[in-house]
Amino acid sequence: MNMSATLILAFAMSMDAFAASIGKGAVLHNPRFRDAIRTGLIFGVIEAITPLIGWALGFFASQYILEWDHWVAFTLLLILGGRMVVEGFKDSPDCRCEKVKNHSLALLVCTAIATSLDAMAIGVGLAFLQVNIFHTAMVIGCATMIMVTLGMMIGRYIGPILGKKAEIIGGLVLIGIGCNILYEHLG
């Protein structure tokens, strides 16, 4: 696969994470640039690892992985998105205490995994092509880091405009991403 095809693949793979990061940036109250970089790194590393896992598993059990990856992604995104929607409707007198809870490492990792399961499926497909999987995975990870960092900063400016609705919208975006993943695999 040539470099332009690799870049197109990488940025296409980062779109789910980009959309989720806009929602995350909007929910947080004035996230700093280092928060955006940290989130970008988490998403980027996970997005780089999942095609490697998929590539390795592609030699052993591709039919089983491809049968279930979309259901796992859908379920994780539905749960995370549903949680955000419910939290968005709760009255919260002190928004500062919500910031830490909504930006926990566990939640970031879980969201990153959910949005990167399609990259694992791509990795399975790449196992049957003549590609340098390590190079491709690194490009996917870097593209995701850039897009997530950018998404967080865009969300930072959208959040104050939307207020508490940002969390509801962010949750709906995650649910929408999950539904889209399910639709693409079942449709």
UniProtKB/Swiss-Prot annotation:
Keyword Cell inner membrane set for record: yes
GO MF term set: manganese ion transmembrane transporter activity
Alphabetical list of PANTHER family matching this protein: MANGANESE EFFLUX PUMP MNTP-RELATED (PTHR35529:SF1)
Reported function: Probably functions as a manganese efflux pump.
HAMAP family: MntP_pump
Family statement: Belongs to the MntP (TC 9.B.29) family.
Protein name stated in the entry: Putative manganese efflux pump MntP
Organism: Pectobacterium atrosepticum (strain SCRI 1043 / ATCC BAA-672)
